Curated annotation (Swiss-Prot):
Expressed in panicles. SUPFAM superfamilies: Barwin-like endoglucanases, PHL pollen allergen. The gene is EXPA7. This is Expansin-A7. GO terms for biological process: plant-type cell wall loosening. May cause loosening and extension of plant cell walls by disrupting non-covalent bonding between cellulose microfibrils and matrix glucans. No enzymatic activity has been found. May be required for rapid internodal elongation in deepwater rice during submergence.
Amino acid sequence: MSPAPRVLVLVVATVVALQVSPAAGRIPGAYGGGEWQSAHATFYGGSDASGTMGGACGYGNLYSQGYGVNNAALSTALFNSGQSCGACFEIKCVNQPGWEWCHPGSPSILITATNFCPPNYALPSDNGGWCNPPRPHFDLAMPMFLHIAEYRAGIVPVSYRRVPCRKKGGVRFTINGFRYFNLVLITNVAGAGDIVRASVKGTSTGWMPMSRNWGQNWQSNSVLVGQALSFRVTGSDRRTSTSWNAAPAGWHFGQTFEGKNFRV
């Protein structure tokens, strides 16, 4: 009589395993596309988005960095003193009575936060001072705005939510500075997209915390020249990625190296 229960246990275990395996394969993260929130959106940068290059996140040429025209400047309420640089958002236009400038079907766009939209206290928040606190506002690259609304609208109500960033390749570390000052620009971050903590390790040092200088530029005042460098970064979803020996011992200032990215 004993073999029968063993067979039953095996069958049940197999069914349970099949049921949980898809969930087990998912990658944890805080931004799976949550509830929509309300904001407004305008545009800047010209039809080719060339005016969006540079910016308060430090990314420089958004084309070469892989961000392209899918970018936006965030108001104070969203920018979070630069900590939101690299975060990804899904945005869609919302028609309101007497204000119907959205494209049919209300298509959504995916953008990365790459710049800061400063407040203009000389103008009221509802008439020109669009980025004044506490307004959540997106100043979109012009091509992205035109994807969701008509040009003549100028400004439109939108719904937005945080979503995971999907990037090609690994996290990129661009090392600038000089012997006693290392300024590392962190770009192309998948997952949460925004980095809240960063550390560096040389071949002859332990892990050393880096401090945010501005945007996604992180600094260390240690002498690291001549050492292979490893980097450890943590996103706002509390996941951490370690890139061992991302930069070889012979690295030079101005070079960019690719490390391990977050899974999405």
